[in-house]
Regions:
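Glycine-rich phosphate-binding "P-loop"
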Residues: 22-30, 244-255
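Conserved proline-anchored active-site loop of SAM-dependent methyltransferases
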Residues: 40, 54-68, 77-82, 124-137, ...
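Short active-site oxyanion
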Residues: 50-54, 73-74, 216-221, 270-274
């Protein structure tokens, strides 16, 4: 017999002093919650305890799942996109030497992109080496790509570092030389000039390398269900990060019906703790319970270009 879950919490609180120390981890993935994942999990711990399983149903790049594991919480990792769950599992199961193989040149990038049947490693190569992690365009412009790619490769081979690359002799030597000065003098905007010294490929590999920490903690196996596949779950915490209402929803396998999702979430809240991450929800049955003032974005969908803060929503009266 299913019993209705009653959780008496007057308001959602967060004592930031209790947040786990160290960097948040997860795949470099579009829409990742890595910037606020540590806060989200600490909010769950402080307000709803640590004894209930957490279902990360729109898991994406795994930032929430990873944070749950690092906090010793039971978590179920799910995303409808099998490519991303396979990628997460693959990175966690591999070592640093394998991660180094993911960095590729501009030419290789478009060769991989053109492949009809892509492997999980191919998916990761496109993810890591693409602008905005969208797997569409190469990370660097055609004009600068060879120099920056070759520099990144040389730093890996000579110094075996992903982070701290600016302190290496190789980086200092090349960025003060004639080759680097050549493309720094091209007619670029000031903002673009400021970005040129960054080797984003190494920064992406550093993010992947951090996921190695999960190897010693847990064996991760993702599922690839629609959220409807969790309709029988009871007595759990459902963390839901659906496509944003009113956005163009690019990158999602199917068009997403927000109202149908809200109806489902409302029903699930009768027997579970349901937390939705979004910028806004039009359904009046839900209300904001926490706002991340430093986590914002500019939404271009639906003609709304105003900056919005990331928020957590729950059914009114359910907490």
């Amino acid at each position: 017999m299913i019993q209705k879950m009653t959780v008496l919490v007057k308001q959602i609180n967060l004592d930031e002093k209790k947040i786990r120390k160290g960097k948040a981890i997860g795949l470099p993935y579009q829409g990742s919650k890595k910037k606020i994942s540590k806060k989200i999990i600490e909010i769950i711990k402080q307000n709803f305890g640590t004894d209930k399983p957490i279902y990360d149903i729109f898991g994406g790049g795994g930032a929430i799942t990873a944070e749950c594991i690092l906090n010793g919480l039971e978590v179920h990792y799910n995303d409808l996109d099998k490519d991303i769950t396979n990628a997460f599992e693959r990175v966690v199961s591999q070592d640093r030497e394998w991660i180094k193989t993911l960095i590729i040149s501009r030419e290789e990038f478009f060769e991989v992109k053109a492949k009809e049947n892509k492997t999980t490693d191919d998916f990761l190569k496109l993810l890591v080496n693409s602008f905005g992690n969208k797997k569409i365009d190469y990370l660097y412009s055609k004009e600068t790509s060879d120099l920056k790619y070759n520099l990144a490769k040389e730093i890996i081979e000579k110094h075996d570092v992903f982070s701290g690359y600016r302190q290496t002799e190789t980086y200092k030597k090349v960025t003060s030389g004639l080759d680097w000065n050549w493309f720094n003098t091209k007619p670029e905007t000031h903002k673009q000039l400021q970005q040129l010294p960054r080797l984003q490929q190494l920064e992406q590999l550093q993010q992947l390398g951090q996921l190695e920490r999960l190897q010693k903690v847990n064996k991760i196996k993702g599922t690839n269900k629609s959220y409807h596949g969790f309709s029988e779950v009871s007595g759990a915490i459902l963390y839901l990060d659906p496509p944003y209402e009113g956005s163009h929803q690019k990158g999602y396998i199917n068009q997403f019906d927000s109202q149908e999702f809200y109806d489902w979430a409302f029903e699930m809240a009768k027997n579970n703790i349901v937390i939705i991450s979004s910028y806004s929800i039009s359904d009046e049955r839900f209300e904001t319970v926490y706002s991340f003032d430093k986590a914002h974005s500019t939404l271009q969908g639906g003609g709304d270009s105003k900056r919005k803060n990331e928020k957590l929503f729950m059914v009114k009266g359910s907490y």
